[in-house]
């Protein structure tokens, strides 16, 4: 029950946590291209290509995002077949074929640290696809068996000007019956939301039935990060019954998503960033997923069908979030969208810790200093538990001579030894597990803080000081992990022990080295937290032991006396 044994327990719990995380990633089937037994022409709608599964809710949604009746083979559009729209947060490239968003640059987020290139979340080309597709099926232009509609526009580039609140770009298409379809994209200042609106003018003498759909398409990927930095890349959705649930690429391969819900949303997630289609919260929407030619995964929604009377005009719209996982902003855009910042099963601890971290950062303006302040706060709040832990261990050490006498008295009779020890603990008012409970209670807090730092896009490219210019990646010179290992070594040296087993002694001696090795690849922000936690532990340990010395509960370790023969 000594301090070093508790340190070993903490280490084992932490390593077990990492191994469990790695096991979860390993047990999740990795996505690999499957052998195609039949080549499906990309020009046919999904309803034809997936005829083997007539219940698939993605029926009617086109498979090919780029294809039009005028250009059925191109995957890289010339500049004349795309337009751009930008506000102060986003720059979108929109294909005139179907009006899909084929590129999205996040202007406030660098691709790499201190680069002049913005982070590109959506992209198309070079063998990779991650796009936001939307259209009108039923009797709409996107259901044409000859391909997607080729829109016309007078706006080649629309940029939010100074003093403007929003910027829009309009695409026009007229079908063979003379029906007019206007697709408008609108960006507001300071927002990551794109409003996609349709104006449909029925020029015929017959009713026109159309159905709005929107989906996110991404090349199948097995990028799951590393053991210490596990990340999720795949789909997710929300319904009235399920607030938030991941739907991975392997889930989509096992079977399509099929949900009907009021409102809801569908999304594609990756580390720090998310794209999500958000339909009308009052419509009964169909959420679906699809695997396209064993190469791409799609997750999307279909709104209810709408009938437009002859010689009438109707409007439909949806919203698209393309941006970082900023909880406060996402919560305002759609219900439960902020849950894409996934803190795991300890979210109820991680959420307030993150809010506290935000509070400190708002005061000091430095995320590294905010981590130090939250460390002081957490360790201060846990000080009563820490003191109780050391008090229990000190009392256990004082009982060691009596426990030794009991073992000598009863010999190999373990039952009598255990009974006598329980009576001794009761008499001396000592809980033999008192040194373990506090450390077990502290571990969930560390894990919760681990996930809150891991999931926080705010720490991406956030500097601390000196050589630490990005708290979301490892220390480039490994200085923090080494200092953390040194601090663990001093904690060991200050902790009295009665461990006699040579194997346990060797394990304890190597724990600082093992932890240092693990932390070499940890984000600098996490290592900073652990280092400062150890520093505070050393201070608390010193103060507690001094108070124990006055009460006779602690004595400084003496060097062993070595007897030599003369």
Swiss-Prot record:
Alphabetized Pfam families for the sequence: 60KD_IMP, YidC_periplas
UniProt-annotated location(s): Cell inner membrane
GO CC annotation terms, alphabetical: plasma membrane
Topology of this chain in the membrane: Multi-pass membrane protein
NCBIfam families: PRK01318.1-1, PRK01318.1-3, PRK01318.1-4, yidC_nterm, yidC_oxa1_cterm
GO MF terms, alphabetically ordered: membrane insertase activity
Chain intervals with Polar residues compositional bias: 31-41, 61-80
Ranges of Low complexity composition bias in the record: 42-58
Subunit structure: Interacts with the Sec translocase complex via SecD. Specifically interacts with transmembrane segments of nascent integral membrane proteins during membrane integration.
Function: Required for the insertion and/or proper folding and/or complex formation of integral membrane proteins into the membrane. Involved in integration of membrane proteins that insert both dependently and independently of the Sec translocase complex, as well as at least some lipoproteins. Aids folding of multispanning membrane proteins.
Region (Disordered): 30-80
Alphabetized UniProt keyword annotations: Cell inner membrane, Cell membrane, Chaperone, Membrane, Protein transport, Transmembrane, Transmembrane helix, Transport
Protein name per Swiss-Prot or TrEMBL: Membrane protein insertase YidC
Family: Belongs to the OXA1/ALB3/YidC family. Type 1 subfamily.
Transmembrane segments: 6-26, 356-376, 433-453, 471-491, 510-530
BP term (GO), one: protein insertion into membrane
